[in-house]
Amino acid sequence: MTYDGELDIAIGLSARSKVWSNKRLKWSELVSRLGEENKTTETFKEFVSASKEDQLKIKDVGGYVGGYLRGGKRSPANVVHRQLMTLDLDFAHKDLWDDFTLQFDNAAVLHGTHKHSDASPRYRLIMPLSREVTADEYVAISRKIAGIIGIDLFDNSTFETNRLMFWPSTPKDMDYYFKVQDGPWIDADEILNSYADWKDSSLWPTASSRFE
């Protein structure tokens, strides 16, 4: 990997973890971890037929937050900084990766979430940022990038700064979708400067009314 570097993430053993462990690691190490195929014991049909509560239990194989948490507490007030953008695309299409690589030459991972299928693609997009950013900067940056890709493709709650992301897993009868692009880390200041005033949240891209 040509474009590597260190960043902070916070790791939890499950979504119910009360304390999260801050860890500094290389982007290449994180990419390697994200590339590991983790099969669960149920079939895809069994998973989508399960209750929302049972689905959560199945896909809870531990997870991470793409930043540093004060005191290891996963609340918005305790997000000290973010340097890893993690966004869920729950309304995606199968050609998303091809479209993304035409729009961006930056470092990125795109992988399928547990409910991903060819018929109904669901992805997670992960991109390292050029520097540590504040919570407000993170939301402005991630919404701008989502706006370029197509913000209606994204889960509307995915921009939360303390958002937990499960480690990837797949039902036992499904293939794991995983793509990597090596490139420069996306320039946080360039994205912020693309706004007339990035602090004005009314300028941030938002989903159309049918997705709100």
What are these regions (language model features)?
Residues 2-8, 12-40, 48, 131, ...:
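Catalytic "initiation/cleavage/transfer" segments centered on a nucleophilic residue
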